[in-house]
Amino acid sequence: MKIPEKILYAHEHTAIDLSGPKNNIDCRLDDFDATVAEYRHLVERGVVSIIDQTNRGMGRNVAYTEKVAAAAGVKITHATGYYKEPFLPPECYTLTEQQLSDIMVRELTVGIEDTGIRAELIGEIGTSKEITEPEAKIFRAASRAHAETGAPICTHTTLGTRGMEQLEIFKSFGVDLSRVVLSHIDLSADLDYMKRLLDQGVNIAFDTIGKCNYQPDGSRAMWLSRLCREGYENQIVMSMDITRRSNFADRGGVGYSYLLDTFAPMACEAGVPEQTFEKLLYRNALRIYKGQSEASV
């Protein structure tokens, strides 16, 4: 199949460090040369932009990420917000909902820390299998920041769960669900659940491609085909969400280009029309995260 000329990866982490709570150094990404090599290969395949979902408490390093972007020749968009327990920094427990929202607004409108580089989205904010009160507080704070700035929001769902509960919080604040992406929904094996979410007007991400220890990619391809055939192709974005060094190609992993080289042809064979991939791999994410403007990509 012919992949689109322009591609936008909707959920990645250029620098991330979840190694502490996970007690696993593999969950730290900080190898500059290896990351640049992976990203350069993506650029060769047509990737023009990457949405970096790393936020406060996840090991975000904007200066490092900008150096990777410059070396690889790709645009990287930065995020603000907080992840989920047990990865939340102390401020999530000591500050009020409004104070947390104010931090997000500042990073969106003024800049992240002392870099002068502004975040362009709130993400990835997450929930555990059961939503904890600190996590709910972050969702409320993010909703307030969205109301003030109009910034898009990306969430983390644990194995695809609690999507409806996340939406209920957003709805209570009047969040524009067309600017919201629920991540990792491809980890849910429930196609009806996926459709119920999409029927709310929200977007979902098939962004754990290649993580076959959770779900086989053949199933992902089948679900994607069904959703596209049933008219949801404008509400789905795609990515790899690589967070482990062992996922890199030079470490024997699938590598970032697996989505384009292996999964996209698999999904095409499963029934996703070739022309639909421009939406799945570029246009949808452009609309959600960039407001259709290609000038900022």
Features from the language model and the residues they span:
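Mid-to-C-terminal alpha-helical segments outside catalytic/metal-binding sites
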Residues: 1, 258-297
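Alpha-helical scaffold segments that flank or form the walls of functional sites
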Residues: 5-10, 24-53, 58-75, 98-116
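Divalent metal-coordination and catalytic microenvironments
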Residues: 11, 50, 82, 146, ...
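Acidic/histidine-rich helix-loop elements
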Residues: 16-30, 90-95, 247, 251-252
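Histidine/acidic-residue-rich catalytic or RNA/ligand-binding cores of hydrolases
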Residues: 18-22, 62, 163-169, 191-197, ...
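Short acidic/histidine-rich active-site segments
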Residues: 53, 207-208, 232-253
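Active-site gating/metal-coordination segments in enzymes
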Residues: 67-70, 75-149, 203, 208-213
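Catalytic pocket-lining loop regions of alpha/beta-barrel enzymes
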Residues: 147-222, 226, 236
